[in-house]
Amino acid sequence: MARYNFFERMEREINFQFEYEKIENIILNEKNGYCTLEDEISENFRRWRLRKNFDSFLELKEYLGFKTEKILKGYTVAWKATGEVKSVDTFILYCEMIINMIFGVIEPDLQSHYRKCINAVQSLIDYDLEQINHYIYRTEDGKYLVVQKDAAASAVADIVAPELADAIIEYNHHLLKGDLKSKKLILKQIADALEPRRAELKTVNKTIENDFFYMINTMNVRHNNCDVSDPSKYNEKFANLTYREKEEWYDEIYQEGLMAYLSLEQVDREKKILDFKTKQKK
């Protein structure tokens, strides 16, 4: 019989409902002395510039399905989470909401007053997301998104303009699964940014250059390649693919675009090293 040590026995599958209720209990009931994180978020919610037409944190939570109810523990009033969080998508939505509330609503100087609670919440969320291969990403305009980990995407995001970096990371957001229109817009952004360096890419990696721009120009990204009335652009093979097959090809284009950027980055790195070597010899 196999023996498992203490840390191996601690490993367990993520129960999204349990994790949600555990995090909510910290937010709703743990105090820094006088107030809870829930109190602080509710007090400052109207200052949040991204709140759209929501007037309170309670309204937002209930709209998203994360309801709470008041309970009595002896003479003490406490709050209990009553929302249903069974799926990974719902759990990710909850995590995005909480992280945006903590770091978007609570002023930085006030966050220090709730450091113990914030650290507890963030460590739980970070750990749970790690188990499902996701992480928290902050966009240039201050939004916090939960996206799937992609080493190539992260590497490219570090070397391109902030706006393009956000788009590259957002491509892996769970809400974009099945959203060809949004994926198409991101692919076009990637292609338009690569276009000025196309000739350079061709000398570095002709195969990637040829394949990437072939797909961009014939798979309904830059042009309408599904319109049979325009024979100059019509791609019958692509047009007849299923919706899912088209998305799979879009994902291939995305990965090819990342490889293009990484190929160019490697050339830049090699030039930098060569320049350093040359100066050293002199």
Model regions and ranges:
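Alpha-helical oligomerization segments
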Residues: 188, 199-282
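A mid-sequence, solvent-exposed acidic-amphipathic segment
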Residues: 165-194, 198-199
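Short amphipathic alpha-helical segments and their helix-coil junctions
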Residues: 64-80, 162-179, 231-241
